[in-house]
């Protein structure tokens, strides 16, 4: 690939000067990290909105309720992706922005380990969704068809967005919602968990009393090893070594 010369004017400095400049920015980056942590803590104290209506979706196994989408877990994150008639590129492509979001989705095993399920929903029929998932390599994303007014009721009928829910038995509550540029941050396990009512569920978080919490890092595992005690022991050993060395992992 042929490249052209950069038409950018920047100072070229010594390694010592470069490191000094980086350290100045690092102070601001850490401030931003703490601010994000504080914002996530406020989200965890948001009031909840009870979902009173019954909503129906179509999935690979047939009809499903909103409660079914939790797949037995405590929390649900639902991203409204635009893949349906009227979208540019239909039926070969989903919305290009929604497709980029799908390309960056964290492996679901890590969210599942925090009692959280992530799903996508569109108005395309299941046959088209399954075809698209295979072609784009998105087989690990649970993707449902919206069949009623769910998208309008939850602010995602005309634009993409991400809703977070929690359930108490059979009762479902809406706990948070992001859209527009808010969706840009989505993709990592941590950012998904940060918009939920329970958060990352780690002891360092400022969370309401009663939120489940465990020591940080110790719940991590390889995505195909959750539930394997031997693998978990190896992770714990790595965490302890990191702490002994003064690190975080």
Where are these regions (language model features)?
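Conserved segment of the thioredoxin-like fold in thiol-based oxidoreductases
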Residues: 117-145
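Non-globular targeting/processing and membrane-anchoring segments
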Residues: 1-114, 134-135, 145-249
